[in-house]
Amino acid sequence: LFLFLEKKIFIMMPNKMIESTEILIIGAGPAGSVAAALLRQQGREVVVLEREQFPRFSIGESLLPQSMEYLEQAGMLRAVVEAGFQFKNGAAFMCDGQYTEFDFRDKHSDGWGTTYQVQRATFDHILAKEAQRFGAQIRFRHEVTSVDIEPEKPVVTVKDPEGNVYQIQANFILDASGFGRILPRLLKLESPSNFPVRGAIFTHIEDRINCSSFDRNKIRATVHPQHGDVWFWTIPFAQGRCSLGVVAETSFLERYKGSDLERLQRIVSEDESLHTLLKHAQWDTPARHIIGYSANVSSLSGKGYALLGNAGEFLDPIFSSGVTIAFKSANLAAALLERQFAGEQVDWQTEYGQPLKRGVDTFRAFVESWYTGGFRRIIFHQGHQPEIRRMIAAILAGYAWDLTNPMVKETARRLTALEALCI
């Protein structure tokens, strides 16, 4: 028995009512909002369940130029441009007094060469409102507590802000829950990451940087002077603020006692260049931390569902790849769902999982090389041909799926070969 209320379909079951929708998205972050917008433009019915109330804080604040293409395709670019975020055109690296930078406009791949550095509370809220503008229904403070994928159409159990529990059935579920990793946790899809357990301590500050050589249009990664696998991010925002964080294995971070802000300040003081750069900073925001952020899953899709962005796999903050991977996954999934709803057979493993992982694996090779020191030796080496740097710049700009770039093919082997030349 079906009951129609306010254009919504409800399935009458014994002693309960199950709501029905075409697409259910878990999480209203970048992946969820972009997927919702794309699917609404296809005419699909979309419900988004978001555990938190927006705006809310998140890290992952330095976008990559490749992201602009996905925002444009989703019809969200204008809203982002008009928000007045900090312009970004590249990335800079510092290690042992050495400095190098990449201008993303000078890259191998075609496409956007500039983007923005964003406060995620504002950025994510903009994307969510854009998804709503396209007609997606977003329910904030609605938490998924269980999922059943055994029925023909999966059923999700949800708790609303008042503590009431209800169920919703969907033709397909997209998990865009980010670090919450709802489906991997509930369906036991999680698998160990190949990376050591690392953590990050971070905050926002009024930076008061008056150094003329500091380029606010670039994210900067600074390597700790005594510990090569420890590094700091400095992400300038508009209005004289920046995001500051340190990334290290948990054993290193545990050496420092006190509040997160005190720990971060002590570690920053160990790098003379960064300490000097921020000597006038106003530390006006409590620091936060995240531990064990790297994650993997046994599969990116299954019966009636697919995992988007960080819900599937998160590598590391070093190359700011998270939001770009989130957008790429949303773009791929929305295109496949359009075909699936048109009656085509879709092989999610070969048409979603494999293409997505191609770029993820390119970023993975870069991350691994960063922590072994190989990537640092490559980028500070002066003898490379300009085209080599353009190939690297393209991947740093997010074009990790561009097969015209030799660095995307056999990335780890090519990085090893380049490192061998840095003598």
Protein language model features and the residues they cover:
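C-terminal helical "tail/cap" subdomain of flavin- and related membrane-associated enzymes
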Residues: A335-I423
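N-terminal FAD cofactor-binding segment of flavoenzymes
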Residues: S58-D96
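N-terminal Rossmann-fold NAD(P) dinucleotide-binding loop
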Residues: G32-S33
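Glycine-rich FAD pyrophosphate-binding loop
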Residues: R40-I59
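FAD/FMN-dependent oxidoreductases across multiple families
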Residues: F252-L336, A342, V346-G353
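Short beta-strand to alpha-helix junction loop
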Residues: H108-K129, E254-S259
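Predominantly flavin-linked oxidoreductase catalytic cores and closely associated redox partners
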Residues: E130-L274
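Beta1/beta-strand and adjacent pyrophosphate-binding region of the FAD-binding site
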Residues: M17-G29
